[in-house]
């Protein structure tokens, strides 16, 4: 058997990992500006945490979850999304307690798992950045969270992003619309895909979310949920639109957007961009005011979003965005002979302890090969260390571009490398 990674997974090698780290750091910095703190939840949860919150009839639960019984006969699932685990943690750790400052703002970065057909930007193990805000029903919370995602895209230089917006209203609004949608779709039931025929019985709003061509055709002229919003839902949605306009965030209303999870109410949104002629969703979320209560906590409003890191990085690459990643090394030590081995290790370690990036040769190669490595590492400074340098207690360090050089004692290198570097690079 050939030992390879499982289908739908990936190895993220150092060159790519640097891009991941950069995007993650920009996300962390952005979220901290909005007073969000990081939360880390287990990669696996009890099956019911996901099935009951995401929805028993959703594709995620019926087709895509990795679930199994462990050795204690507990039904476990690898998390397919981030919101339900965070809500479970919010309730379990009593973050709703009066002494905890509201709203509670949390973000997470981690792996999610779904059994689906692997394709570009969509894997079976994928990585998600997400945020959740608990305790505020104010529509300004919706807009601030959407604006935070928009702010992140601006910082990363992502272009041609369109905000798609809709409201699912209150449970009462949705119930009235549900019956209207059933009445509209039932006469064309046979024209729907098999999945959507099932959805029509179980959760007809899911038909609007279908990607199948025949389903898209069927719902093209479906009644709009916005016509069924009650007064409170309408006021909430109008406030969201007004505040988005006040922040100069353009949007389009998409009445067929329902999102792939059952827990949403009121505002839902997606950020969509075009890549090579195809529309791609890069971020999606919305309001969920009943989920905390569903997990046994007090009724608590919530709002959040998730975005896929793989897809985000693919879009960055396709749009030709160069991320400002530091790839240069401060100093490279070329080592000649066994007599310099110990001193080279001592020096390189002392230089690193002063805050510099440094590498040395460990393979006993010829000097030409070592200088080639220095160039590959984009080393700013290069030092050659052999038997004569060890005996003298000093060595020549040179600027790898200008070739300017200076002879420096080991003592100075080990205690004051900043001055040496400044002298050669200024």
UniProtKB/Swiss-Prot annotation:
For this UniProt record, give its keywords in alphabetical order, as a comma-separated list. Aminoacyl-tRNA synthetase, ATP-binding, Cytoplasm, Ligase, Nucleotide-binding, Protein biosynthesis
Give the EC number(s) under which this enzyme is classified.
6.1.1.21
Q: Name one Pfam family in it.
A: tRNA-synt_His
The GO cellular component terms are: cytoplasm
Q: Which domain of life is it from?
A: Bacteria
- Specify where it is mainly localized: cytoplasm
As one GO molecular function, the record gives: ATP binding
- Tell me the Gene3D superfamilies matching this sequence: Anticodon-binding domain, Bira Bifunctional Protein, Domain 2
Subcellular location(s) of the protein? Cytoplasm
If you read the UniProt record, what top EC class would you report for this enzyme, in one word? Answer: ligase
Determine if Protein biosynthesis is one of this entry's keywords: yes
Reaction catalysis annotation: tRNA(His) + L-histidine + ATP = L-histidyl-tRNA(His) + AMP + diphosphate + H(+)
Task: Give GO terms for biological process.
Answer: histidyl-tRNA aminoacylation
Quaternary organization: Homodimer.
Q: Which family does it belong to?
A: Belongs to the class-II aminoacyl-tRNA synthetase family.
What is the protein's name according to its record? Histidine--tRNA ligase
């Amino acid at each position: 058997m050939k030992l390879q990674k499982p289908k739908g997974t990936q190895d993220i090698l150092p060159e790519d990992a640097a891009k991941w780290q950069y995007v993650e750091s920009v996300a962390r910095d952005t979220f901290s500006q909005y007073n969000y703190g990081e939360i880390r939840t287990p990669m696996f949860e009890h099956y019911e945490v996901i099935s009951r919150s995401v929805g028993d009839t959703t594709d995620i639960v019926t087709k895509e979850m990795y679930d199994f019984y462990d050795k204690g006969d507990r039904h476990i699932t690898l998390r397919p999304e981030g919101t339900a685990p965070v809500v479970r943690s919010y309730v379990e750790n009593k973050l709703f307690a009066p002494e905890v400052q509201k709203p509670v703002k949390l973000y997470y970065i981690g792996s999610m798992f779904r059994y689906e057909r692997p394709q570009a930007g969509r894997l079976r193990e994928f990585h998600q950045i997400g945020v959740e805000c608990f305790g505020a029903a104010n529509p300004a919370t919706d807009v601030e969270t959407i604006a935070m995602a928009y702010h992140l895209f601006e910082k990363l230089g992502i272009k041609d992003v369109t905000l798609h917006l809709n409201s699912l209203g209150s449970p009462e609004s949705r119930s009235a619309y549900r019956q209207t949608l059933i009445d509209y779709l039932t006469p064309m039931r046979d024209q729907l895909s098999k999945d959507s025929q099932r959805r029509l019985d179980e959760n007809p709003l899911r038909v609007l979310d279908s990607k199948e061509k025949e389903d898209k055709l069927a719902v093209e002229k479906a009644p709009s949920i916005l016509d069924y919003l009650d007064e409170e839902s309408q006021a909430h949605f109008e406030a969201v639109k007004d505040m988005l306009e006040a922040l100069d965030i353009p949007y389009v209303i998409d009445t067929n957007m329902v999102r792939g999870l059952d827990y949403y109410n009121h505002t839902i949104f997606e950020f969509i961009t075009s890549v090579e002629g195809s529309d791609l969703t890069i971020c999606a979320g919305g309001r969920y005011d009943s989920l905390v209560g569903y997990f046994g906590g007090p009724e608590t409003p919530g709002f959040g979003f998730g975005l896929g890191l793989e897809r985000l990085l693919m879009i960055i690459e396709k749009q030709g965005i160069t991320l400002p990643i530091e790839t240069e090394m401060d100093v490279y030590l070329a080592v000649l002979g066994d007599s310099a081995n110990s001193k080279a290790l001592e020096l390189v370690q002392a230089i690193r302890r002063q805050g510099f990036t440094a590498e040395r040769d460990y393979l006993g190669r010829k000097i030409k090969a070592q200088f080639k490595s220095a160039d590959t590492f984009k080393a700013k400074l290069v030092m050659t260390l052999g038997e004569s340098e060890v005996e003298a207690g000093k060595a020549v360090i040179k600027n790898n571009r200008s070739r300017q050089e200076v002879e420096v004692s080991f003592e100075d290198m080990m205690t004051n490398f900043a001055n040496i570097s400044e002298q050669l690079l200024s």
